[in-house]
Amino acid sequence: MAVISKVTYSLYDQKEINATDIIISHVKNDDDIGTVKDGRLGAMDGALCKTCGKTELECFGHWGKVSIYKTHIVKPEFISEIIRLLNYICIHCGLLRSREPYSDDINLKELSGHALRRLKDKILSKKKSCWNSECMQPYQKITFSKKKVCFVNKLDDINVPNSLIYQKLISIHEKFWPLLEIHQYPANLFYTDYFPIPPLIIRPAISFWIDSIPKETNELTYLLGMIVKNCNLNADEQVIQKAVIEYDDIKIISNNTSSINLSYITSGKNNMIRSYIVARRKDQTARSVIGPSTSITVNEVGMPAYIRNTLTEKIFVNAFTVDKVKQLLASNQVKFYFNKRLNQLTRIRQGKFIKNKIHLLPGDWVEVAVQEYTSIIFGRQPSLHRYNVIASSIRATEGDTIKISPGIVNSQNADFDGDEEWMILEQNPKAVIEQSILMYPTTLLKHDIHGAPVYGSIQDEIVAAYSLFRIQDLCLDEVLNILGKYGREFDPKGKCKFSGKDIYTYLIGEKINYPGLLKDGEIIANDVDSNFVVAMRHLSLAGLLSDHKSNVEGINFIIKSSYVFKRYLSIYGFGVTFKDLRPNSTFTNKLEAINVEKIELIKEAYAKYLNDVRDGKIVPLSKALEADYVESMLSNLTNLNIREIEEHMRQTLIDDPDNNLLKMAKAGYKVNPTELMYILGTYGQQRIDGEPAETRVLGRVLPYYLPDSKDPEGRGYILNSLTKGLTGSQYYFSMLVARSQSTDIVCETSRTGTLARKIIKKMEDMVVDGYGQVVIGNTLIKYAANYTKILGSVCKPVDLIYPDESMTWYLEISALWNKIKQGFVYSQKQKLAKKTLAPFNFLVFVKPTTEDNAIKVKDLYDMIHNVIDDVREKYFFTVSNIDFMEYIFLTHLNPSRIRITKETAITIFEKFYEKLNYTLGGGTPIGIISAQVLSEKFTQQALSSFHTTEKSGAVKQKLGFNEFNNLTNLSKNKTEIITLVSDDISKLQSVKINFEFVCLGELNPNITLRKETDRYVVDIIVNRLYIKRAEITELVVEYMIERFISFSVIVKEWGMETFIEDEDNIRFTVYLNFVEPEELNLSKFMMVLPGAANKGKISKFKIPISDYTGYDDFNQTKKLNKMTVELMNLKELGSFDLENVNVYPGVWNTYDIFGIEAAREYLCEAMLNTYGEGFDYLYQPCDLLASLLCASYEPESVNKFKFGAASTLKRATFGDNKALLNAALHKKSEPINDNSSCHFFSKVPNIGTGYYKYFIDLGLLMRMERKLSDKISSQKIKEMEETEDF
């Protein structure tokens, strides 16, 4: 098939509809001939097509037609287009509406765009009546009546026939089409002689039951039948028009219906394009429960017999396979035979006689039961990233479940509690070859962004890894027994005694080095814990091996070590019993006694405080402060439990070093002090969304406690441990949390899935070009993909080493640091980066040497400097800043830290060039990779828990998925959280006093009312401690009261006095007269006074000022004060003195003030911050998404495609059925570039893998090189002239 590079859309011409010779003229028939179910319209339900004689799979259907007897029927979706055109012409004479007469000798094609617009304004202006002297009729407004189902004159509601409109529109001369934006013959907006009947393929029969009788039909078929019926009856134009609208889009005439029609099946998420073309149900698939198997490797998948006997694979007949096929036929293993010459598929059964059907010519194929070692794709849903779907080799296994290696369960998010997986056997040999390379676990070993292995040990293998390393004094036989089938090549090197360390050295099998971890392939760390063997860890031994050699060695280590760990467990055993957890009851009894004693003390102290408040001995705290103090006392109790347990664990390790539970804890697998606290100490405070349960009826959560009880246990503090068991009320509190979590999981799965789809839709066409830049279509997004122009899985986070005077080249390193340090001090100067991105893991090649053998200091510096200069020019074209790479090499290879030989240095830089040249291929789908990683992470995070910035009473800056969602939706006209940072607290306090909401009621006033002869007197007594606590003054309180009364419309006259009652209290006396009705208005006034007398912006949040240590540099910190305030616009801060105050606005304020580039940087950091600690590696995908959202002059939401419009097919694929209609109407031409369009036209998308060669425009490179060399030579001449002048 020829490669299609461009597609043009247009409307069907009436001649094309008339050209079909299948005439439909009957409503019902015995053999369906001539009806809308005519067999000539295509193959259905196993029957061959009566037009072309082909099967369902080969026949795409044929169109029919029904005569409409010269009636003019409007194509329903273009009613609005017809009304638009009628607004430009006179319905009486058909000439264009114009302010003045126009001539028809203008050549519009010769006019410029500007001149055409001016002519448009002149000719198509609004005027009351026609300028044509032979017409002079007033212009009529034509609309479409839903009630009458026809066009009507808006003025008098009289029907306007379709034929009249048809005549007027086709009479518009072609030369005026550009003026009216007509792109094709207007007659195409109507059906005239015949109406088209679509093929059967788009209306498959649906079975349903009516009155116990099964019926098979399709709603579209029924609606087409109604059109045929009306046409046969020669019905009125409106009747046929209504039938056509009901078939096309019922919503045009009726709002409250959801019946199936053409519009319904092509729009929304269940549209036919999505269900039948983009993805569809396939055969040769299986689904089953999964289970673990220790006999298969990471690259294999175990398949039960019933799946192996059901699925078949094709073997094509050619010179290489013909003998094998003959053997298979002879041994009766062939299930189907396809004869290409006869176009015939034959099922081969036992005892069936086959004559003259088997010729075994090239192109024929046979189907046999799937064989071992065939590549099969399998995966677990939801497929959040590409590690969920992989292609492995089939192995025959016993039982009825699909078996997978425990090494891959982490990457698939699977466990063995009933999870199911699906598998599909691809039939096309090209597909099988492609999947066996690109989707093979060895290929996918390292994470696309994180760079660490996605496969690794789980559960008891982690404990085995820890125990194996610690084992000592093994004889050779014991070592060989542990190594099992891998022991044949073990070399004892003359030793008699061995340790676990020797077994690891053998398994690693490479002379690999890594600072503090490996030396010549030997582990020099104190212990092997989970960090060395599990997936997604940078210190994973498999990852270091693959960085040193290749993924093959990495996978081999995982396979071999997994086997050895399991053998170790089967030989030496490992088990945890309740006795390991709780050897005797002494410790738990002691903990329980401490907990009971402490909680009683807390309750006693709290009760004393409440009694003192009631008796007026002390002034009560605010509700938030009171809750905070109770919370901190309970936290102290929890921390006491953890401290006791940590001490107990330490003591147990001394007394019983072989305690298996503590071994697990040391190995980094399961059981930490917090988990032990739940089991042995106390179950702790139960929270919903980070807060204790709210009180409900009668001021309590459960009826186990007295009304309005302040008992901490009544708010969800569970004192008992799980060992002791929970009481009824405690169980209900734990279930209260479980209920809210299960609801959250259900809702969040749906929300995160929706956003993930949108992000992938937005980023899917973003790829790497031949120059290592990121592009989308023809738009450049990033100069350097992954910042290093090296594949993301090859890049590696390394420690960021800060400049130090003890370093060699200190001045050069310090100068570089000053250039790049801004990027490492982030999050409002609160954080200092500890890691940075290295272009590859060069540390595995760093082999320490002695001073004598080491490369000279100057030679090493020159080498680093020359390499970076060369790379900067030849790979980054001096456009991108790569100072960070130079900084990494200068600090990590610094002679003051480590001495290396010249050979080691050369190896490192050769590897560097190798990675630059061969890892990142043109066409790498970096957009999809980034979108999947972001989506997978925020889905996991939304399901695990919601984390917020903890600050009592303040605006809780929502983190996690909610905030990520808000950032990507970019809603305008919403309040934004503005952060103010300053070292001068007084600057922030003035903002706080103005914006923080304080009402009279918060000051616990004592309000009394009395009536005097001609007025009411209100006394408001406030304790000054409350005023001080609210951080305001007495004058502000006076102002609050005064402001409220002065603006009150129910107060007729008023006066006010302020008295100092005593050293603690102040009295505000207000004298009032109310407008009539006095009594009612007095009641209203007294009711609203505590809340309505206020100051600041109305909000339930306070604005606390917190202090933190801010970084100016890695060695320079200062005390800073910070506060967050919710504002609509920064103009509200205009009247304050904010000199030397750093203001961090929200995204839209940032854009309005600093422009699009600042908005991009803000979005990138804000999105990254929503993930919380430990997700710094997501900076690159966040940066890519932020760059895309800010690719034009204004930030654009992930929901929209305003800039860089999406192709018609992409819109149609994602459920916009109007996209194809509009493209056809405007006769759009579009290139076939994006994924969706390529899918439709069988074109390979422009994405690569980094495995294949790619081609680049060398001419452009040569021109760039010439320009650069010209520039350099002119610069050198200039320098020489200056030197001579000197």
Swiss-Prot record:
Cell compartments where the protein resides: Virion
Keywords associated with the record: DNA-directed RNA polymerase, Nucleotidyltransferase, Transcription, Transferase, Virion
Pfam families for the chain: RNA_pol_Rpb1_1, RNA_pol_Rpb1_2, RNA_pol_Rpb1_3, RNA_pol_Rpb1_4, RNA_pol_Rpb1_5
EC number: 2.7.7.6
GO cellular component terms attached to this protein's record: DNA-directed RNA polymerase complex; virion component
Keyword Hydrolase on entry: no
The protein's enzyme class: transferase
Domain of life: Viruses
Gene3D superfamilies, A to Z: 1.10.132.30, 2.40.40.20, 6.10.250.2940, RNA polymerase ii, RNA polymerase II, clamp domain
Catalytic activity: RNA(n) + a ribonucleoside 5'-triphosphate = RNA(n+1) + diphosphate
Keyword Transcription: yes
Similarity-based family: Belongs to the poxviridae DNA-directed RNA polymerase 147 kDa subunit family.
Subunit and partners: The DNA-dependent RNA polymerase used for intermediate and late genes expression consists of eight subunits Rpo30/OPG66, Rpo7/OPG90, Rpo22/OPG103, Rpo147/OPG105, Rpo18/OPG119, Rpo19/OPG131, Rpo132/OPG151 and Rpo35/OPG156. The same holoenzyme, with the addition of the transcription-specificity factor OPG109, is used for early gene expression.
Function as written in the Swiss-Prot or TrEMBL entry: Part of the DNA-dependent RNA polymerase which catalyzes the transcription of viral DNA into RNA using the four ribonucleoside triphosphates as substrates. Responsible for the transcription of early, intermediate and late genes. DNA-dependent RNA polymerase associates with the early transcription factor (ETF), itself composed of OPG118 and OPG133, thereby allowing the early genes transcription. Late transcription, and probably also intermediate transcription, require newly synthesized RNA polymerase.
Protein name, UniProt field: DNA-directed RNA polymerase 147 kDa polypeptide
